[in-house]
Amino acid sequence: MLKRIKPDEIHLGMFIEAIDGNWKGQRFWRSRFLLASPEEADTLRASRVEWVVINTEKGTDVAFADVKARCLSAEAQLTRALKTVEQSKPLIKSIFEDARDGNSLPIDVAMQVVDDIEACMRDSSQALIQVTRLKARDEYTFLHSIAVAALMIHFGRSIKMTDATVKELALGGLLHDVGKVKIPPEILQKSGPLTDAEMITVRQHPQNSFEILSRHGNISEAVLDICLHHHERTDGKGYPDGLLGEEIRPQVRIASICDVYDALTSRRAYKKAWTSDDAVKFMLKQEGQFDRVLLRNFFYSMKF
């Protein structure tokens, strides 16, 4: 059976029947061959080829390759997830420091982090989500940003959102709490209950995030909306604007689910991490706070 796939879907063991696109000048002197060399696979993925036709009777299929990719050892997945997190933390920290100091934000760096998280989520999604659940007090905001971005990617893909929308979700998840740089660390890192005055200060962070990012002309409306309204609730009891139901765009409703889910399932100095099931069951009991259709779909997507 012949199947037309994108170059980034190819894997070793596939039989290449035809190459569609500008492949002249590449080192593929033939267009029908068994892909057995990692070097050829990398060259083909990096080429200007638009489509590749594979013959599943002579080589492996995409489905087989996907299974093989998912079957990476648990140790390999954990290693990759840890590496992604460790590489991302200083980059996110630098973005937040620029925001704190009033500097122009390096959005290209933020997109680099998004791309790294997206790549890791393709074959190590469970490991990455697990790794980000253990958060040191002074790193909570940075790891929470990675976790929410990862959850948004995972959920967006599971409900078949476009690649562009998923990337937008991820950027919103990564930057949604950047406004917390305006909040004193002693409030953010407080292990006990916040006073009323402290709570008012904390609740200013969505508006802070919006104002910081609004200074950049290349931030989409959806990302700005995620930053400003991720604490809104469908029953109208959220903040800062008390939006109700459909007044909250779907991307923001997804962000609110991922934001709360990560907070509940994260291990902190003052609380144990909740299980995924317990977190979603708790959220389902919060009548009217979350989009129930999206929340149930999110719950199903987390059944790794």
Residue map of PLM features:
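Non-catalytic interface/linker regions that flank or bridge core catalytic/transmembrane domains
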Residues: 1-135, 139-140
